[in-house]
C-alpha cells in the first residue's frame, strides 16, 4: 500500500487528525481532533480542485443539478475552529446557509460522500485546504459613529454589529444608542447596503414605558442603558420591565460616579433579571471601583471592550485621553478629570485577563471609536489568550495543544454574543442551517487579516492583489471589497435583527430596505450558564481603598505584558 508522510499529506490536502497548527505568531496551538473529509484510515479521493485533481467531471464532480440538491459552494478541507470543536471537513453552502459539514464529492465514484455535499455542475469551490475556518465575528458593542466602521469591521473578520448611534453626534460618540423611531428607521436604511448583520439598540434610559415600546416597534432589537443618559435604579427597573414583556436584551453601562447608588443598588434594581453588562472591568464605565464584581452573578452576562485587552504597559497611558474625548469632558475642569481618573485602575484591568481565562467574562466587543477599535476585536481576543497561556500555562484538558482555551476564547466573539442577544438561531457558529457568515484564515495570519470573509455564502471581503496584474497575487495585497459587498447582494445575504413587535407592527413595509428583517429570540430566561465555555462564577472582591482584586480569595498580581504577538510583525504602524 502506498503511504504518505504527514508532511506530504498536509502539503497535498492540508493538515489532518493529530496535526497541530500554530495560530499566527502566538504561543497557541490547536490540534485537529477529527478529519471528516479524509485523513488516517479515510485517505483517498479527498475533494480538491485544480488541474489534474479530483473535482472534475465524472470524477469528483457528479451530474447532480441544483434542483437535485447540489450545494452552491463547497469549501474544501478547512480546519473548523468553533466553540463545539476543532475538526477538518468540507463545508457546503446553499441558499446562503451552511447545508453540510463532512466529505464532499461524487457518490457515484467516491465512498463516504455526505448526501448534502454532492458536488455538481452548479457548485463553486473555495479551497480551504491548509486554512482555518471560523464563524464570522459578532461585535456586541458598536457605536455607529461613521460608516467607515463597516469596512474596518469586515476587514477584521466581523460579520455582525450590535449597538447604536446616528453618526458623529455627541450622544452617539458617548453612548451605544439609536434613540427614537425616526433615527432607528434612518439607520436601518443607511446600513442596508453593507454585507453585515445589524442589531440596533434603542435608548433605555427612561421611566416612560411608552417611549421604549415605540422604539421596539420602530426596529430596536433591544435597549442600552448608559450613565451619560442617567442609569438610575428607576430607569434600570423600567427598562427591564419592558424587556421582560418584549423578550429583548438590555445592555448596561452603569453609574461610574455612584451618584444614584452603588453597585449593590444597581444589582438590587436589576433584581435577578437578565442583563448584558458592558465593559465589566470598568475602564469603559461603570460603578467605580467594583463594577467588576457583577461577573460573579448568575443573571449577569458580562463582556469586555477591547482597549483593555490584554493588560499591557501601554494600557493606562492611552485610556485617560480616550475617556476625556469620548465622554465630552474637559481636562481643565477638576470634576471631569476626577471622573476620568476614577475609571482607570490597573488592578481591575489585570484581573480582567484572569476572568477571561477562567471563562467568567463571557464576551468581547470593540466599543468602536468610543474607547475601542472595531478592527481589533478578534486580534485582541487572541492576544489575551496568548498572554494568559504564558502566565498560567495550559488549561485543564489541554496538553500539547490548546484546544480548550481556543474554544473558550473564540466563543467570546461568536456564539456567546449571539446567544446573549437572541441571534443564535441564525448566526454565531459553524453549524448546519445557520447563515454562511464564515471567515477563512491562513494560519500565519490567523486573527490578524482574513484570507476571505463570506457573508451569507457570498465572498464579501478578501485579501486581493493588484487588479491589473496577470494573476490575483501580485502586491500590494490588501483587504478589499468583493462582489458580495455590492449593495443588492449585501441586502440579499444580510439580516436586520429587530423585535417581534416590529414585525407584527408592519415595520418592513414602512422602511426603504431590501434585506430581510428577523425577530430576535426571547432572551429573558438566559443566565450565565447559557454562555458556552464562559459560564464561570467565581467570588470577586475589590478593596475599596487599594482597589486590590481577589478572585476566589486569591490576589491576582499586576503583570502588564511588555510584548505581544499579532502586532508589529504584521503592521507598519
Curated annotation (Swiss-Prot):
Substrate binds at residue 226. It comes from the Bacteria. Its cofactor is Ni cation. It is found in: Cytoplasm. Residues 136-573 form the Urease domain. The keyword Cytoplasm applies. It catalyses: urea + 2 H2O + H(+) = hydrogencarbonate + 2 NH4(+). InterPro entries: Amidohydro-rel, Metal-dep_hydrolase_composite, Metal_Hydrolase, Urease_alpha_N_dom, Urease_alpha_subunit, Urease_AS, Urease_asu, Urease_asu_c. Pathway: Nitrogen metabolism; urea degradation; CO(2) and NH(3) from urea (urease route): step 1/1. Its main location: cytoplasm. GO terms for molecular function: nickel cation binding; urease activity. The keyword Repeat does not apply. Ni(2+) 1 binds at residues 141, 143, 224, 367. Ni(2+) 2 binds at residues 224, 253, 279. PANTHER family: UREASE. NCBIfam families: PRK13206.1, PRK13207.1, urease_alph. HAMAP family: Urease_alpha. Heterotrimer of UreA (gamma), UreB (beta) and UreC (alpha) subunits. Three heterotrimers associate to form the active enzyme. This is Urease subunit alpha. It comes from Nocardia farcinica (strain IFM 10152).
Amino acid at each position: 500500500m502506498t503511504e504518505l508522510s504527514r508532511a506530504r499529506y498536509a502539503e497535498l490536502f492540508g493538515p489532518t487528525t493529530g496535526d497541530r497548527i500554530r495560530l499566527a505568531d502566538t504561543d497557541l496551538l490547536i490540534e485537529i481532533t477529527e478529519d471528516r473529509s479524509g485523513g488516517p484510515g479515510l485517505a483517498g479521493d479527498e475533494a480538491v480542485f485544480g488541474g489534474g485533481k479530483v473535482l472534475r467531471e465524472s470524477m469528483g464532480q457528479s451530474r447532480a443539478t441544483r434542483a437535485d440538491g447540489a450545494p452552491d459552494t463547497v469549501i474544501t478541507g478547512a480546519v473548523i475552529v468553533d466553540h463545539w470543536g476543532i475538526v477538518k471537513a468540507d463545508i457546503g453552502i446553499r441558499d446562503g446557509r451552511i447545508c453540510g459539514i463532512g466529505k464532499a464529492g461524487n457518490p457515484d465514484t467516491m465512498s463516504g460522500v455526505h448526501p448534502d455535499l454532492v458536488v455538481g455542475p452548479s457548485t463553486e469551490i473555495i479551497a480551504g485546504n491548509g486554512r482555518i475556518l471560523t464563524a464570522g465575528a459578532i461585535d456586541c458593542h458598536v457605536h455607529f459613529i461613521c460608516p467607515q466602521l463597516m469596512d474596518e469591521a469586515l476587514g477584521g473578520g466581523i460579520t455582525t454589529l450590535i449597538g447604536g448611534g446616528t453618526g458623529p453626534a455627541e450622544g452617539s460618540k458617548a453612548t451605544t444608542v439609536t434613540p427614537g423611531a425616526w433615527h432607528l428607521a434612518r439607520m436601518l436604511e443607511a446600513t442596508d447596503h453593507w454585507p453585515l448583520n445589524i442589531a440596533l439598540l434603542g435608548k433605555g434610559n427612561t421611566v416612560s414605558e411608552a417611549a421604549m415600546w415605540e422604539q421596539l416597534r420602530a426596529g430596536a432589537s433591544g435597549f442600552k442603558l448608559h450613565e451619560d443618559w442617567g442609569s438610575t435604579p428607576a430607569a434600570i427597573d423600567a427598562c427591564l420591565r419592558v424587556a421582560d414583556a418584549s423578550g429583548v436584551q438590555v445592555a448596561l453601562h452603569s453609574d461610574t460616579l455612584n451618584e444614584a447608588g452603588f453597585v449593590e443598588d444597581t444589582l438590587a434594581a436589576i433584581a435577578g433579571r437578565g442583563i448584558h453588562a458592558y465593559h465589566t472591568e470598568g475602564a469603559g464605565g461603570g460603578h467605580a471601583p467594583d463594577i467588576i464584581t457583577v461577573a460573579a452573578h448568575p443573571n449577569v452576562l458580562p463582556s469586555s471592550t477591547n482597549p483593555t485587552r490584554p493588560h499591557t504597559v501601554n494600557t493606562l497611558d492611552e485610556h485617560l485621553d480616550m475617556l476625556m474625548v469620548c465622554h465630552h469632558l474637559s481636562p481643565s475642569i477638576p470634576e471631569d478629570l476626577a471622573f476620568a481618573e476614577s475609571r482607570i485602575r490597573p488592578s481591575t484591568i489585570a484581573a480582567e485577563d484572569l476572568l477571561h481565562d477562567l471563562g467568567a467574562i463571557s464576551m468581547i466587543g470593540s466599543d468602536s471609536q468610543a474607547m475601542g477599535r472595531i478592527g481589533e476585536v478578534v486580534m485582541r481576543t487572541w492576544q489575551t489568550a496568548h498572554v494568559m497561556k504564558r502566565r498560567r500555562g495550559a488549561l485543564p484538558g489541554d496538553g500539547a495543544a490548546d484546544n480548550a482555551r481556543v474554544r473558550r476564547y473564540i466563543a467570546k466573539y461568536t456564539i456567546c454574543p449571539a446567544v446573549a442577544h437572541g441571534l443564535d438561531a441564525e448566526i454565531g457558529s459553524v453549524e448546519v442551517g445557520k447563515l454562511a457568515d464564515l471567515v477563512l484564515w491562513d494560519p500565519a495570519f490567523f486573527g490578524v487579516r482574513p484570507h476571505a470573509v463570506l457573508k451569507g455564502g457570498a465572498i464579501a471581503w478578501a485579501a486581493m492583489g493588484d487588479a491589473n496584474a496577470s494573476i490575483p497575487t501580485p502586491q500590494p495585497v490588501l483587504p478589499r471589497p468583493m462582489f458580495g459587498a455590492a449593495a443588492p447582494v449585501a441586502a440579499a445575504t444580510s439580516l436586520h435583527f429587530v423585535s417581534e413587535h416590529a414585525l407584527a407592527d408592519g415595520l418592513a413595509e414602512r422602511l426603504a430596505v431590501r434585506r430581510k428583517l428577523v425577530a430576535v429570540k426571547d432572551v429573558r430566561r438566559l443566565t450565565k450558564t447559557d454562555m458556552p465555555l464562559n459560564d464561570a462564577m467565581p467570588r470577586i472582591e475589590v478593596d475599596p481603598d487599594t482597589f486590590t482584586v481577589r478572585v476566589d480569595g486569591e490576589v491576582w498580581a499586576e503583570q502588564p505584558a511588555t510584548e505581544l504577538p499579532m502586532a508589529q510583525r504584521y503592521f507598519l504602524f
